[in-house]
């Protein structure tokens, strides 16, 4: 099974490249946000617990998210593998994901780290804000999101370096050029 974690700062192209990876390799897409919303909407036991945390303005605990992801994996039984979108974001989440996957006889195959210069990230996000109308794509919010990424999320790359799973992908250039680099990295893992 090919299990991919796609990683990068806001605006690095994770969504765009995820779609291409899914098509190219026939992977199932697991978006943590979608899973969380789905569990809450279906009013599952885990969904009710998560909703309680969210309504109190608290973060949903890692264990709960991992349990939800485990349920999705167990129900989907992906034949070729999975691309994880939005998870893990911290080292404890990465360790919990590894444990859960190991219990199912698999592991993360590769962590693709899309690396884009900060000026380019800001440019892309401001442009996306104009096109999509996303209210969180304004300069002040963008800078705040990038700060959070650098302080809280970026250290996760070092964890995957230690695991021998990290591949830095130059995220500059055309969509096709970037995807070419991704394919080269993934094909070396398969």
From Swiss-Prot:
ATP binds at residues 11-16, 128, 173. GO terms for molecular function: adenylate kinase activity; ATP binding. InterPro entries: Adenylat/UMP-CMP_kin (IPR000850), Adenylat_kinase_CS (IPR033690), P-loop_NTPase (IPR027417). The keyword Nucleotide-binding applies. Gene3D superfamilies: P-loop containing nucleotide triphosphate hydrolases. Residues 127-137 are annotated as: LID. It holds the Pfam family ADK. It catalyses: AMP + ATP = 2 ADP. It comes from Parabacteroides distasonis (strain ATCC 8503 / DSM 20701 / CIP 104284 / JCM 5825 / NCTC 11152). It is found in: Cytoplasm. Monomer. Keywords: ATP-binding, Cytoplasm, Kinase, Nucleotide biosynthesis, Nucleotide-binding, Transferase. Residues 31-60 are annotated as: NMP. This is Adenylate kinase.
């Amino acid at each position: 099974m090919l299990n991919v974690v796609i990683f990068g700062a806001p605006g690095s192209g994770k969504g765009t490249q995820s779609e291409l990876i899914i098509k190219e390799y026939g992977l199932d897409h697991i978006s943590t946000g979608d899973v969380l919303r789905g569990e809450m909407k279906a009013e599952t036991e885990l969904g009710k617990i998560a909703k309680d945390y969210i309504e109190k303005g608290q973060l949903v605990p890692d264990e709960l998210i991992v349990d939800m992801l485990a349920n999705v994996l167990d129900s989907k039984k992906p034949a070729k593998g999975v691309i994880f979108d939005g998870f893990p974001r911290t080292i404890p989440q990465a360790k919990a994901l590894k444990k859960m996957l190991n219990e199912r006889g698999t592991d993360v195959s590769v962590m693709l780290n899309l690396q884009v210069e900060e000026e380019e990230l800001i440019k892309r996000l401001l442009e996306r804000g104009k096109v999509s109308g996303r209210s969180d794509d304004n300069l002040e919010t963008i800078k705040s999101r990038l700060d959070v990424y650098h302080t809280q999320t970026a250290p996760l790359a070092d964890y995957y370096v230690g695991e021998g799973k990290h591949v830095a992908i130059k995220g500059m250039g055309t969509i096709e050029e970037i995807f070419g680099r991704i394919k080269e990295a993934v094909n070396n893992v398969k």
